[in-house]
């Protein structure tokens, strides 16, 4: 099974009860991986939220990924970590989490892309594909052509991130990309289960 296919990234603006409801419903709808992302909270709150998501995922095959924080991933024994370019180096993160955990890395330009295959990572988060309200600091948008180029450049699985919604999913899926990461299309949906089912249906 392709665990990267429909990759939910949580919204750190949502309270704990909403987070739990969204994740539970999204997994029922077919989400294949969940990344808990916290940019504003303290570590204790991050651990609490990560543990709550882990409890929801424990009887499923859906991996739990922690954004940025290796310490939080270790604290809750998550399935993996997703690093940004300004986070801990991938080589050090790999030493800390061990060989069997999933390690992802955000890639924002061609130089980082060419280096990626030499790093001890399992997948790439190609960011940002399109302009997005949740990623205000990205300097480059890859677009469809950039995504196609990246798929030809690296042997690693690619998860497309940034500005992805129902209008561009068919076009993205047609590139053969391994997975699509979404925040608002699922987290802000009235019915996250139905939204996940619908989004999966657009991926042909």
UniProtKB/Swiss-Prot annotation:
Taxonomic lineage from the root: Bacteria, Pseudomonadati, Pseudomonadota, Gammaproteobacteria, Vibrionales
CDD domains assigned: TMP_TenI
Protein name (Swiss-Prot/TrEMBL): Thiamine-phosphate synthase
Catalytic activity: 2-[(2R,5Z)-2-carboxy-4-methylthiazol-5(2H)-ylidene]ethyl phosphate + 4-amino-2-methyl-5-(diphosphooxymethyl)pyrimidine + 2 H(+) = thiamine phosphate + CO2 + diphosphate; 2-(2-carboxy-4-methylthiazol-5-yl)ethyl phosphate + 4-amino-2-methyl-5-(diphosphooxymethyl)pyrimidine + 2 H(+) = thiamine phosphate + CO2 + diphosphate; 4-methyl-5-(2-phosphooxyethyl)-thiazole + 4-amino-2-methyl-5-(diphosphooxymethyl)pyrimidine + H(+) = thiamine phosphate + diphosphate
InterPro entries (UniProt xref): Aldolase_TIM (IPR013785), ThiamineP_synth_sf (IPR036206), ThiamineP_synth_TenI (IPR022998), TMP_synthase (IPR034291)
GO cellular component: cytoplasm
Physiological role: Condenses 4-methyl-5-(beta-hydroxyethyl)thiazole monophosphate (THZ-P) and 2-methyl-4-amino-5-hydroxymethyl pyrimidine pyrophosphate (HMP-PP) to form thiamine monophosphate (TMP).
Residues annotated for 2-[(2R,5Z)-2-carboxy-4-methylthiazol-5(2H)-ylidene]ethyl phosphate binding in this entry: 132-134, 163, 183-184
Pathway(s) the chain acts in: Cofactor biosynthesis; thiamine diphosphate biosynthesis; thiamine phosphate from 4-amino-2-methyl-5-diphosphomethylpyrimidine and 4-methyl-5-(2-phosphoethyl)-thiazole: step 1/1
Alphabetized PANTHER family for the sequence: THIAMINE BIOSYNTHETIC BIFUNCTIONAL ENZYME, THIAMINE-PHOSPHATE PYROPHOSPHORYLASE
Residues binding 4-amino-2-methyl-5-(diphosphooxymethyl)pyrimidine: 35-39, 67, 106, 135
Enzyme class: transferase
Keyword DNA-binding listed: no
Keyword Metal-binding attached: yes
BP-aspect Gene Ontology terms: thiamine biosynthetic process; thiamine diphosphate biosynthetic process
Annotated cofactor note: Binds 1 Mg(2+) ion per subunit.
Keywords: Magnesium, Metal-binding, Thiamine biosynthesis, Transferase
Entry's Gene Ontology molecular function annotations: magnesium ion binding; thiamine-phosphate diphosphorylase activity
Cofactor field: Mg(2+)
Record: residues binding Mg(2+): 68, 87
EC annotation from Swiss-Prot or TrEMBL: 2.5.1.3
Family statement drawn from the similarity comment of this UniProt entry: Belongs to the thiamine-phosphate synthase family.
